[in-house]
Curated annotation (Swiss-Prot):
It comes from Scheffersomyces stipitis (strain ATCC 58785 / CBS 6054 / NBRC 10063 / NRRL Y-11545) (Yeast). It is found in: Cytoplasm, Cytoskeleton, Actin patch. This is Myosin-1. Residues 1101-1161 form the SH3 domain. Belongs to the TRAFAC class myosin-kinesin ATPase superfamily. Myosin family. Residues 1012-1028 have a biased composition (Polar residues). Residues 1-24, 965-1101, 1164-1210, 1232-1256 are annotated as: Disordered. GO terms for molecular function: actin filament binding; Arp2/3 complex binding; ATP binding; hydrolase activity; microfilament motor activity.
Length: 1256
């Protein structure tokens, strides 16, 4: 897709830094994560040697970890056992993950291939190399399994069918193309390249194609000891279906020469019967008809019976059939004439020609050796053509309706082989492996370094072995002919006699390797020094195997078959025509393998390759056995050390500037906007802008002439991760904006609705308060704080109904699943055996049916909540209170039990608590008197007396319980009523709450005012000035009090909704206008000074004052910090805590009363009542608060002019001007300092705004 350019926006928007992300997930310990042994990537080794690589692979292998990386190359060591690492759970673990997020695995390679296909629209392939038995076939199967599972939509039947057929090719082709060898129980005796084609729209498999390479057909007729024929022969003979047994005369594998001569019929770990069932199932999935399956097994039976044809010598020493019944049954299976079959095996027809004229025809009898060779050639020809037809038939089924341009290729080919006797098959197999090694070198080592030079990238060249010289030794035609050319030339020279052709080939070997140091000629043998080791090949029989053509007599025999599958499919007339055409040289086996190998190289070169290098740890195929010398040899010839060195010095990813911009232009606001490409410059400048916007260090990339090179895969994965999250982030941004807009509308609507409901129906919380006050009206003294006009019965003070916070923690821990109508903190009086009663803190939660009394305990240093008592409200007999202002309430049950006894509790909101109980249980009796009775134990009543006292032992705002007596100071009269709610101040809408994210929420201590969550439409009681109707002992408040000079900054910021001193309420004194100088005045005697003002009685502070003896950090939610030696108000005392206010009443909260000591109020508290004095310019200005400076200026400006004598008028004016200038300077400094402090406090505490919303 081409880049769509779009004009840039003309509006310049200031780019702001995004706020810090607050949704960090909690870190969890992975109990199932295994300890890593060695390093997962060999590039991380501290020392790069073959021995270090071997040691690392050995450690991981013994730990059951068989996979290791070299950059993007996967190293696999065959475990020779099932490790259970390919199940559905493992597959899902690697799905959608890059290779750095998960341990090394073949699934990671498969995921990377599929991701690159989707993301970069490039063909992918995986090259699996290694020697025989190293695990190449298993790796290919697992890659096919992974891609088929992750790429298929389960809802699409057609796609699922393609997936099933692709997977079914594995058991089918393994049965016909794999065999047990000395080194491998499931060795591929052919090569295949599977290409899975994907649709361009949804990247699902729509077709596939298999290319076959060089089946080892010699294995059909002979195997070395302890090896087996192809699996299908043992599957068919051991578990043959009944109809085939009767129709084809199938018996056990020991009956047939081709399956029993190597003396290996059974193999550990191979279940031939089960494998045949899988083969038959695969045939059905692929779509082979019953007739096609019958023909396949008819040919298998024919081959088995052909092998049982044996010979004897006749009188002339020629070969004769030992048992005619065998040939007759073979003729029945092939549906040919038995006599023609016998003649084709024991005779050879030779035609002579004389120039252009046809000559004579001779029937030449064959000896036993020659007849055996013809018999085997017939069996090999039938099996080879049958296998090629099966591959073609599979391709017909896998062919899709639509063509796709993008594929994933999986190469599964025979590994490098070195046997005791090596012939033409081994040289072909090793040649293909040399070609694959050459591809690996070209695409990883040579191509990488060549590209660095071309792109002018800084690079240190690394030496490596290029095996092209070995490939040329085998396949070259000119200037120096190679081995394959010499073989073909030998056949052409002596085509009639195989032995003579072998001798000609042996003579030509000296010319082939004369100047090649990787070749050695031996008598009757020759050595090629392959990349994997030196291999000695035998000349005998090579030319005959290279012919790869059936005898004309055999082809003519099979063309007479009455079975169309034989004479039209396996051996069509075109085959006979090509053999009888003497003008055209038939294609040899070496020609075929050379053409196939070069086609394979061309196909792989068009793909983005992935590599898997397999290693065989031992020759005995035993698990947990690791032969160091053998593995070290493989490490050397695979070139792992050079690969590690180049990888460490190279770059993990490179692509053209255009492709990079196309992929990642979204990541920079300068190159992409709303999904469109808006960059106006060239591609290289766009690449620089993208890397800059993504904060990629310059050390992590280099820019070439046409490409950008990324050094580490972590950088690439980071870019890909940002790209994947781009659209999600854009959608989230739009959602946030929309939610802000909707939230503002909803909040505005709720505010209007709340105001209208209050205006129309009244405030329900205040109505509940008035109802509750009526229950105790005239019967109980009241606390001053209960009589505030802003006091409302909000109920859930701990926020138990909220979706988060400490209240939600309470109900979750205790299992409360009912609606909470009241929650708060208080104390309970508990008595223990042999001890006096003790006041213990508790949490009280009231639902519609139950009172929960909850204890906070520390278990293993963790806070736990335990439900101590559950009291049913319907079981309450009465509640008892005293007539004084104390907070004690007794709950008495009809039938108390040890688990639900009567309780004696103390809580600040006792009137509200009782009101809710009365609302829930209207028949509840409320007893108020001088004593309170409740049952400490069932049937044992306890009486508590209440007395009023003013002694110093009684706290101002609490009580003393001792020996069944509660002593409390006098409260407000029982007839007191709440005044009208004060009018709230007007203010602007705080829009910051719609934009600021990540603000820490606070969980305040119990308070007499509701939390922000439970009271959205009410002002806090602290905001209002309280004026109870009856307050005999209250001292009139001064008009304006001076704040105390503090030695430390304020301990906490002012809560946002608390009243703040408005700047316009305190105006600085305007400078006095300079007047025209007055005319000289006649000097007279100065008048007497005015009398001093009368001394007023010292003002009494509104609350007791206490001095802090220690510093207190205020870390507990709802508390206020204390600064040593600073004086504070203490409004009330509850146990060991006091409600503390600063002297300017800007902050309040709870603090330990033991940290405070009562003291006399400071003189600065009554600065407004002191007599005015003439201001004197200080020698050094002192930093004062803004309020004190303004107060001083006001006092100075209010001094009457008549008090200044006429004689000192000029001196007085000069002094006044100097004082005024000093005051202005001091005022400016104070304002500046105040602003700095305010800004600092705002910065320091911006995240804790909600924490200061403390309750009283």
């Amino acid at each position: 897709m081409a880049i769509v350019k779009r004009g840039g926006r003309t509006k310049n928007k200031t780019q702001q830094q995004a706020p810090a992300k607050s949704g960090i997930k909690k870190a969890e310990f992975d109990l199932h994560k295994s300890k890593e042994v060695g390093v997962s990537d060999l590039t991380l080794l501290s020392k790069i040697t073959d021995e270090a690589i071997n040691d690392n692979l050995h450690k991981r292998f013994m730990n059951g970890t068989i996979y290791t990386y070299i950059g993007h190359v996967l190293i696999s060591v065959n475990p020779f056992q099932d490790l259970g690492i390919y199940g559905p759970e493992t597959l899902s673990k690697y799905r959608g993950r890059n290779r750095l997020e998960v341990p090394p695995h073949v699934f990671a390679i498969a995921e990377s291939m599929y991701y690159n296909l989707k993301s970069y629209n490039e063909n992918q392939c995986v090259i699996i190399s290694g020697e025989s038995g190293a695990g190449k076939t298993e790796a290919a199967k697992q890659i096919m399994q992974y891609i088929a599972n992750v790429s298929v939509d389960s809802g699409n039947a057609e796609i699922s069918k393609i997936k099933d057929m692709v997977l079914a090719t594995n058991p089918l082709l393994e049965s016909f193309g794999c065999a047990k060898t000395l080194r491998n129980n499931n060795s591929s005796r052919h090569g295949k390249y599977l290409e899975i084609q994907f649709s361009e729209s949804n990247h699902q498999p729509i077709a596939a194609h298999i290319t076959n390479y060089l089946l080892e057909k010699q294995r059909v007729v002979s195997q070395i000891t302890n090896e087996r024929n192809f699996h299908i022969f043992y599957q068919f003979t051991k578990h043959c279906p009944t109809q085939y047994q009767q129709q084809f005369g199938i018996q056990g594998p020991e009956t047939y020469v081709y399956t029993s001569s190597a003396k290996c019929i059974n193999v550990d770990g191979i279940d031939d019967s089960k494998d045949l069932d899988e083969t038959l199932s695969a045939m059905k999935i692929i779509g082979l008809t019953e007739l096609e399956q019958n023909n396949i097994f008819r040919m298998i039976a024919s081959i088995l019976w052909i092998g049982n044809v044996s010979f004897v010598e006749d009188e002339s020493g020629n070969a004769a059939i030992r048992d005619d019944s065998v040939t007759q049954f073979v003729a029945y299976l092939l549906e040919v004439n038995p006599e023609i079959l016998k003649k084709a095996i024991v005779e050879r027809v030779i035609e002579t020609t004389h120039g252009m004229r046809r000559g004579s025809t001779y029937h030449v009898p064959l000896n036993i050796v020659q007849a055996t060779s013809v018999r085997d050639a017939l069996a090999k020809g039938i099996y080879n053509n049958l296998f090629e037809w099966i591959v073609e038939r599979v391709n017909v089924s896998l062919k899709g309706a639509s063509q796709s341009s993008k594929t994933i290729g999986i190469l599964d080919i025979y590994g490098f082989e070195i046997f005791e006797h090596n012939s033409f098959e081994q040289i072909c197999i090793n040649y293909v492996n040399e070609k694959l090694q050459q591809i690996f070198i070209q695409l990883t080592l040579k191509a990488e370094q060549d590209e660095y030079v071309k792109e002018q990238i800084k690079w240190t060249p690394i030496d490596y072995f290029n095996n092209k010289v070995v490939c040329d030794l085998i396949e070259a035609t000119r200037p120096q002919p190679g081995l394959f050319a010499a073989l073909n030339d030998s056949i052409k020279t002596a085509h009639a006699d195989s032995d003579a052709a072998d001798q000609v080939f042996a003579q030509r070997l000296s010319m082939v390797g004369a100047s090649n140091r990787h070749f050695e000629d031996r008598k009757g043998k020759f050595i090629i020094k392959h990349y994997a080791g030196d291999v000695t090949y035998e000349v005998a029989g090579m030319t005959d195997k290279n012919k790869d053509a059936l005898l004309r007599d055999l082809v003519e025999l099979l063309s007479t078959s009455a079975n169309p599958f034989v004479n039209q499919v396996l051996f069509p007339p075109s085959l006979l025509a090509s053999i009888t055409d003497s003008k055209k040289r038939p294609e040899t086996a070496s020609d075929k393998i050379k053409r196939s190998a070069n086609d394979l190289v061309g196909t792989l070169s068009k793909c983005q390759p992935s590599y898997i290098r397999t290693i065989k740890p031992n020759q005995t195929k035993r698990p947990k056995e690791y032969e160091n010398q053998q593995v070290l040899h493989q490490i050397k010839y695979l070139g792992l050390k050079e690969n590690v060195r180049i990888r460490r010095a190279g770059f993990a990813f490179r692509t053209t500037f255009e492709k990079f911009v196309q992929r990642f232009y979204l990541l920079s606001p300068a190159t992409g906007y709303a999904g469109d490409y808006i960059w106006r410059g060239d591609d290289i400048s766009a690449v620089k802008e993208i890397l800059k916007s993504c904060f990629i260090p310059a050390t992590e990339y280099q820019l070439g002439t046409t490409k950008v090179f990324i050094k580490t895969p972590e950088t690439l994965f980071g870019l890909e991760d940002m790209r994947d999250k781009y659209w999600h982030n854009m959608a989230a941004r739009i959602q946030r904006a929309w939610r802000r807009y909707v939230k503002r509308k909803e909040d505005a609507a709720r505010t209007i609705q709340s105001a209208w409901r209050i205006k129309k129906h009244g405030n329900q919380f205040e109505q509940l308060r008035d109802y509750g006050n009526g229950l105790v009206q005239g019967r109980k003294e009241r606390r001053r704080m209960s009589m505030l006009g802003s006091r409302a019965f909000m109920g859930d003070y701990l926020g138990c109904s909220d979706t988060s916070g400490y209240g939600r923690f309470i109900v979750t821990q205790t299992g409360i699943n009912e609606k909470v109508v009241f929650s708060g903190r208080g104390e309970i009086l508990l008595s223990k055996f042999g001890r006096s009663s003790k006041r213990l803190p508790r949490i009280f939660v009231v639902t519609r049916t139950t009172i929960f009394i909850i204890a906070e305990v520390l278990i293993e240093k963790r806070l736990q909540l335990q439900s101590e008592f559950k009291i049913p409200i319907s079981g309450l007999n009465y509640v008892a209170l005293s007539h004084l202002q104390d907070n004690w309430v007794a709950l008495s049950l009809h039938s108390p039990t040890p688990s639900t006894p009567d309780v004696f509790i103390s809580l600040d909101f006792k009137t509200e608590f009782v009101t809710h109980l009365k609302k829930i249980n209207p028949g509840l009796t409320i007893n108020i008197g001088t004593t309170v009775q409740y049952q400490k134990k069932p049937g044992k009543f306890h009486t508590v007396k209440f007395i009023s006292g003013n002694s110093s032992d009684v706290p101002e705002y609490g009580d003393v319980y001792k020996s069944g007596t509660v002593t409390v100071k006098p409260g407000l009269p029982s007839s007191s009523r709440n005044p009208k709610r004060p009018r709230g101040k007007s203010g602007k809408v705080d829009y910051s709450k719609y934009y600021n994210r990540g603000v820490k929420k606070s969980f305040p201590v119990p308070s007499a005012r509701p939390t922000a969550a439970s009271q959205p439409s009410y002002k806090s009681p602290v905001e209002q000035s309280y004026q109870p109707q009856v307050l005999a002992y209250q001292t009139p408040r001064p008009e304006e009090a001076k704040p105390v000079q503090r030695k430390a900054p304020p301990p906490a910021p002012v809560v946002q909704n608390q009243p703040q001193r408005q700047p316009q309420a305190i105006e600085p004194v305007r400078p006095v206008k300079k007047t025209a100088p007055s005319p000289p005045v006649r000097k007279t005697a100065p008048p007497p000074p005015p009398p001093p003002p009368a001394l007023s009685a010292p003002a009494k502070p509104k609350f007791p004052t206490y001095k802090a003896m220690y510093d207190y950090d205020g870390s507990v939610a709802g508390s206020i910090p204390l600064v040593k030696d600073v004086v504070y108000y203490v409004e009330s005392i509850n146990g060991k805590w006091g409600l503390v206010k600063t002297l300017d009443e800007s902050k309040e909260g709870w603090s330990p009363i033991d940290y405070l000591s009562q003291c006399e109020p400071p003189s600065s508290l009554f600065g407004a009542a002191n007599p005015p004095s003439r201001p004197v310019a200080p020698s050094q200005p002192k930093v004062q608060s803004r309020e004190s400076t303004v107060a001083s200026a006001a006092v100075s400006s209010s001094t009457p002019a008549s008090t200044v004598s006429n004689g000192s008028l000029s001196n007085g004016l000069a002094e006044a001007l100097r004082a005024k200038k000093t005051e202005e300077t001091t005022l400016a400094g104070s304002l500046a300092d105040a602003l700095k402090k305010r800004q600092g406090a705002t910065r320091d505490d911006s995240d804790d705004e909600d924490d200061d919303d403390d309750d009283w």
